A protein has these predicted regions:
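Acyl-donor binding region in acyl/amide transferases
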Residues: 49-111
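A conserved beta-strand-loop-helix scaffold within acyl/acetyltransferase catalytic domains
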Residues: 1-54, 98-196
Length: 196
C-alpha cells in the first residue's frame, strides 16, 4: 500500500517533481496506479498499468505528459536503468514517457527517444519573448491578430472536449464515455473548478 503522504513529500522534495506525479493527480488520471519505491520514499516511480484480455501492460495516461523516476538527488544513467529493470515482468508491453531528468543509455534497443519541449516560466514574459526565434514571434503575432488569447476560466469539460475532438479522435482507447465522465468529474472535484 502506498503511503500517499510520504509519496507526496518525496515529490515535493524532488529536484524533478511535477504535477503529474502528485498522488492526487495520479488518482484522477489513473486510479489503479502502483509504484516502485526505493527505501523510505527516497526515490519513486509511478506505474500506470492495466490488463486487457489477461495481458498486463503499462501506458501513458491521458493528460500526463511525462512520468518516470522522482528523486531528491540527480539520477545517474545507472540509477534510472535500475528502476527500469525493476518494473515487474508481468508488464508485457510498456509505453511510458520518462521525464527529461531520467537519462538512459542510447544502447538500449527498447527505448525510443521523442522530442519534448518545455518552456521555463521562472523568468518574466518579456525575457522569455526576447529569447524566442523569429518564427515563434511571427506565429505569436498571427495569433494575436486572429484574436486568439489565453483563457484562464475554462471548464474541465471544455478541456476534455478539445482533447477528444483533436488528439482523442486518433486514440483508439479514448472512446469510453464512462472514463471521460469520471475524468471530468474528478477534475471538477479535485481542482476546484465548477460546472455551468
Amino acid at each position: 500500500m502506498i503511503d500517499k503522504k510520504c509519496w507526496d513529500d518525496c515529490i515535493a522534495k524532488s529536484f524533478n517533481g511535477s504535477v503529474y506525479a502528485w498522488s492526487w493527480y495520479l488518482d484522477i488520471v489513473h486510479p489503479q496506479w502502483d509504484a516502485l519505491i526505493e527505501n523510505d520514499y527516497e526515490r519513486v516511480m509511478p506505474l500506470t498499468g492495466k490488463s486487457k484480455f489477461g495481458i498486463s501492460y503499462m501506458f501513458q495516461p491521458f493528460f500526463v505528459q511525462q512520468l518516470g523516476i522522482y528523486s531528491q538527488s540527480v539520477l545517474s544513467e545507472t540509477e534510472v536503468g535500475n528502476f527500469i529493470y525493476a518494473i515487474p515482468e508481468k508488464y508485457k508491453l510498456i509505453e511510458y514517457r520518462l521525464n527529461e531528468y531520467n537519462k538512459v543509455s542510447n544502447d538500449w534497443d527498447f527505448i525510443r527517444n521523442h522530442r519534448n519541449v518545455e518552456l521555463d516560466l521562472i523568468y518574466d514574459y518579456q525575457y522569455i519573448y526576447n529569447n524566442y526565434n523569429k518564427n515563434t514571434k511571427r506565429n505569436l503575432a498571427k495569433a494575436e491578430s486572429a484574436g486568439l488569447c489565453l483563457d484562464r476560466n475554462i471548464y474541465p469539460e471544455e478541456i476534455i472536449r478539445l482533447f477528444r475532438d483533436n488528439r482523442g479522435k486518433d486514440v483508439k482507447h479514448w472512446n469510453d464515455e464512462a472514463d471521460r465522465r469520471r475524468a471530468t468529474d474528478e477534475l471538477v472535484c479535485k481542482c476546484g473548478a465548477y460546472r455551468a
